[in-house]
Amino acid sequence: KLLLVVCALALARVEAAAAAACSCAESLTVSKAKDRAEAVFVGTVVEANRERTQGGYEWRVKLSVEQAWKGSDEGEVVVYVLGDDCAVSFEAGKRYLVYARRQEGRGRLVTDSCARTALFDAGSEDLQKLGAGKQRAAR
């Protein structure tokens, strides 16, 4: 019985730690998320690759920008996804609303589960509050 109790407590601690790792210090409003971001845009995933790093893995996602509110003047943007377990899962061919910031010391664009990045939804609160944005010309 004691072993069963110890195992149950250990499992509860692991689940609590995983849940805490996926929670955000604060829930960002659309305005605050835009202010903190270097780039805010809607884009379609061209490719998403899981790459090995010294600390494990990370996702490198290339997106074709369709509409932008901040930054991302280029036609294609590469964003790295931090927090592999909790972050948005990017899939090739799907559209996303991305809030990305510059990673300190590396200068690359990154996003994570707390940045409001999400699968595109034309009726979302984010798009209503962001307004029109700048459309990219079709090639």
Regions found by a protein language model. Name each.
Residues 3, 13-139:
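Transition segments tied to proteolytic processing and entry into folded domains
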